[in-house]
Amino acid sequence: MNGFTRRTKEKMETIEEATISLLDLGIDNIKIADIAAKAMVSQVSIYNYYGSKDKVIKAAFERLMNNQIQCLEKLIETDMPFKEKLEQLLTFKKQTINHLNIYKYSSQDTQFIQFLSSLYSKSSPLFIRFIQMGKKSGDIRENVSDTTLMFYFDMIVQSLTHLPIPHTSAVN
Protein backbone atom coordinates (compact mmCIF):
# COMPACT_ATOMS: atom_id res chain seq x y z
CA MET A 1 0.00 0.00 0.00
CA ASN A 2 1.49 3.34 -0.99
CA GLY A 3 1.65 6.30 1.38
CA PHE A 4 -1.32 8.15 -0.13
CA THR A 5 -3.58 5.10 0.07
CA ARG A 6 -2.49 4.37 3.64
CA ARG A 7 -3.12 7.98 4.77
CA THR A 8 -6.50 8.01 3.04
CA LYS A 9 -7.49 4.76 4.76
CA GLU A 10 -6.33 6.07 8.15
CA LYS A 11 -8.22 9.32 7.65
CA MET A 12 -11.40 7.46 6.70
CA GLU A 13 -11.07 5.24 9.79
CA THR A 14 -10.69 8.36 11.94
CA ILE A 15 -13.76 9.95 10.33
CA GLU A 16 -15.83 6.80 10.86
CA GLU A 17 -14.71 6.46 14.50
CA ALA A 18 -15.60 10.12 15.10
CA THR A 19 -19.01 9.53 13.54
CA ILE A 20 -19.58 6.46 15.73
CA SER A 21 -18.91 8.56 18.81
CA LEU A 22 -21.62 10.98 17.66
CA LEU A 23 -24.33 8.39 16.89
CA ASP A 24 -25.81 8.82 20.37
CA LEU A 25 -26.87 12.33 19.35
CA GLY A 26 -29.31 10.87 16.87
CA ILE A 27 -28.72 10.83 13.15
CA ASP A 28 -30.71 13.98 12.47
CA ASN A 29 -28.58 15.91 14.97
CA ILE A 30 -25.21 14.90 13.55
CA LYS A 31 -23.62 17.60 11.40
CA ILE A 32 -20.70 17.20 9.02
CA ALA A 33 -19.04 20.08 10.88
CA ASP A 34 -19.24 18.08 14.13
CA ILE A 35 -17.75 15.00 12.48
CA ALA A 36 -14.96 17.07 10.91
CA ALA A 37 -14.13 18.76 14.22
CA LYS A 38 -14.09 15.47 16.13
CA ALA A 39 -11.96 13.74 13.44
CA MET A 40 -9.75 16.81 13.03
CA VAL A 41 -10.24 16.87 9.26
CA SER A 42 -11.87 19.36 6.93
CA GLN A 43 -15.50 19.06 5.92
CA VAL A 44 -14.30 18.95 2.32
CA SER A 45 -12.33 15.77 3.08
CA ILE A 46 -15.48 14.10 4.36
CA TYR A 47 -17.40 15.06 1.22
CA ASN A 48 -14.49 13.95 -0.98
CA TYR A 49 -14.31 10.52 0.68
CA TYR A 50 -18.00 9.82 1.19
CA GLY A 51 -20.02 12.25 -0.90
CA SER A 52 -22.72 12.88 1.69
CA LYS A 53 -23.60 12.79 5.36
CA ASP A 54 -25.77 9.72 4.72
CA LYS A 55 -22.85 7.76 3.31
CA VAL A 56 -20.43 8.61 6.12
CA ILE A 57 -23.04 7.63 8.71
CA LYS A 58 -23.70 4.33 6.95
CA ALA A 59 -19.96 3.60 6.71
CA ALA A 60 -19.58 4.39 10.41
CA PHE A 61 -22.55 2.20 11.30
CA GLU A 62 -21.10 -0.66 9.27
CA ARG A 63 -17.77 -0.26 11.09
CA LEU A 64 -19.57 -0.21 14.44
CA MET A 65 -21.57 -3.34 13.68
CA ASN A 66 -18.52 -5.23 12.42
CA ASN A 67 -16.64 -4.23 15.58
CA GLN A 68 -19.55 -5.40 17.70
CA ILE A 69 -19.67 -8.77 15.94
CA GLN A 70 -15.98 -9.20 16.80
CA CYS A 71 -16.68 -8.27 20.44
CA LEU A 72 -19.55 -10.76 20.51
CA GLU A 73 -17.27 -13.50 19.18
CA LYS A 74 -14.72 -12.73 21.91
CA LEU A 75 -17.42 -12.70 24.59
CA ILE A 76 -18.73 -16.10 23.56
CA GLU A 77 -15.23 -17.59 23.58
CA THR A 78 -14.36 -16.39 27.09
CA ASP A 79 -14.19 -18.81 30.00
CA MET A 80 -16.65 -16.93 32.20
CA PRO A 81 -19.82 -18.69 33.38
CA PHE A 82 -22.81 -18.75 31.02
CA LYS A 83 -24.94 -16.48 33.22
CA GLU A 84 -22.25 -13.78 33.23
CA LYS A 85 -21.95 -14.07 29.46
CA LEU A 86 -25.73 -13.72 29.19
CA GLU A 87 -25.69 -10.56 31.31
CA GLN A 88 -22.94 -9.09 29.16
CA LEU A 89 -24.76 -10.14 25.99
CA LEU A 90 -27.92 -8.37 27.13
CA THR A 91 -25.95 -5.25 28.03
CA PHE A 92 -24.25 -5.47 24.64
CA LYS A 93 -27.63 -5.75 22.89
CA LYS A 94 -29.02 -2.74 24.79
CA GLN A 95 -26.06 -0.66 23.67
CA THR A 96 -26.47 -1.85 20.09
CA ILE A 97 -30.17 -1.06 20.09
CA ASN A 98 -29.33 2.59 20.76
CA HIS A 99 -27.74 2.74 17.31
CA LEU A 100 -30.47 0.91 15.44
CA ASN A 101 -32.45 4.03 14.64
CA ILE A 102 -30.42 3.93 11.44
CA TYR A 103 -32.90 1.28 10.23
CA LYS A 104 -35.56 3.90 9.54
CA TYR A 105 -32.92 6.17 8.10
CA SER A 106 -31.76 3.75 5.44
CA SER A 107 -34.70 1.46 4.81
CA GLN A 108 -34.64 2.29 1.08
CA ASP A 109 -30.94 1.50 0.61
CA THR A 110 -30.71 -2.02 -0.82
CA GLN A 111 -26.94 -2.29 -0.30
CA PHE A 112 -27.35 -1.36 3.34
CA ILE A 113 -30.20 -3.83 3.75
CA GLN A 114 -27.89 -6.50 2.29
CA PHE A 115 -25.23 -5.49 4.81
CA LEU A 116 -27.73 -5.86 7.67
CA SER A 117 -28.73 -9.24 6.30
CA SER A 118 -25.09 -10.36 6.23
CA LEU A 119 -24.70 -9.19 9.83
CA TYR A 120 -27.64 -11.35 10.80
CA SER A 121 -26.02 -14.26 8.96
CA LYS A 122 -22.81 -13.72 10.95
CA SER A 123 -24.49 -13.27 14.31
CA SER A 124 -27.00 -16.14 14.08
CA PRO A 125 -24.38 -18.92 14.25
CA LEU A 126 -22.77 -17.11 17.18
CA PHE A 127 -26.07 -17.03 19.01
CA ILE A 128 -26.70 -20.72 18.22
CA ARG A 129 -23.25 -21.53 19.62
CA PHE A 130 -24.11 -19.44 22.69
CA ILE A 131 -27.36 -21.39 23.14
CA GLN A 132 -25.47 -24.68 22.84
CA MET A 133 -23.04 -23.52 25.54
CA GLY A 134 -26.01 -22.72 27.79
CA LYS A 135 -27.47 -26.16 27.21
CA LYS A 136 -24.13 -27.85 27.85
CA SER A 137 -23.70 -25.95 31.13
CA GLY A 138 -27.27 -26.77 32.20
CA ASP A 139 -28.41 -23.14 32.17
CA ILE A 140 -30.80 -23.77 29.26
CA ARG A 141 -33.06 -26.82 29.20
CA GLU A 142 -32.14 -29.33 26.50
CA ASN A 143 -35.78 -29.73 25.40
CA VAL A 144 -36.06 -26.08 24.27
CA SER A 145 -35.20 -25.91 20.57
CA ASP A 146 -32.59 -23.52 19.20
CA THR A 147 -35.18 -22.30 16.70
CA THR A 148 -37.60 -21.39 19.48
CA LEU A 149 -34.94 -19.50 21.41
CA MET A 150 -33.83 -17.69 18.24
CA PHE A 151 -37.45 -16.78 17.50
CA TYR A 152 -37.95 -15.23 20.94
CA PHE A 153 -34.61 -13.49 20.86
CA ASP A 154 -35.38 -12.01 17.43
CA MET A 155 -38.82 -10.97 18.63
CA ILE A 156 -37.33 -9.15 21.63
CA VAL A 157 -34.74 -7.41 19.46
CA GLN A 158 -37.37 -6.42 16.88
CA SER A 159 -39.66 -4.99 19.56
CA LEU A 160 -36.79 -3.00 21.05
CA THR A 161 -35.81 -1.55 17.67
CA HIS A 162 -39.30 -0.13 17.19
CA LEU A 163 -39.45 1.59 20.56
CA PRO A 164 -38.52 5.24 20.67
CA ILE A 165 -35.16 5.49 22.38
CA PRO A 166 -34.84 8.49 24.66
CA HIS A 167 -31.62 10.43 24.49
CA THR A 168 -29.71 10.40 27.73
CA SER A 169 -29.77 13.63 29.63
CA ALA A 170 -28.82 14.84 33.05
CA VAL A 171 -31.55 14.46 35.63
CA ASN A 172 -31.66 16.95 38.47
Residue ranges, per PLM feature:
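Basic, helix-initiating cap at the start of DNA-binding domains
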Residues: 1-25, 29-38
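Short secondary-structure transition hinges
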Residues: 94-128
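Short hydrophobic/aromatic patch on the recognition helix
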Residues: 39-50
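Short amphipathic alpha-helical segment with a characteristic S/N-K-E followed by hydrophobic residues
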Residues: 15, 52-58, 67
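Short, basic, alpha-helical segments at the C-terminal edge of helix-turn-helix-like DNA-binding modules
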Residues: 32, 62-69
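Hydrophobic alpha-helical connector segments
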Residues: 59, 70-98, 150-153
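Hydrophobic/aromatic-rich alpha-helical bundle segments in the mid-to-C-terminal region
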Residues: 105, 135-172
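The DNA-contacting recognition helix of HTH DNA-binding domains
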Residues: 12, 43-44, 54
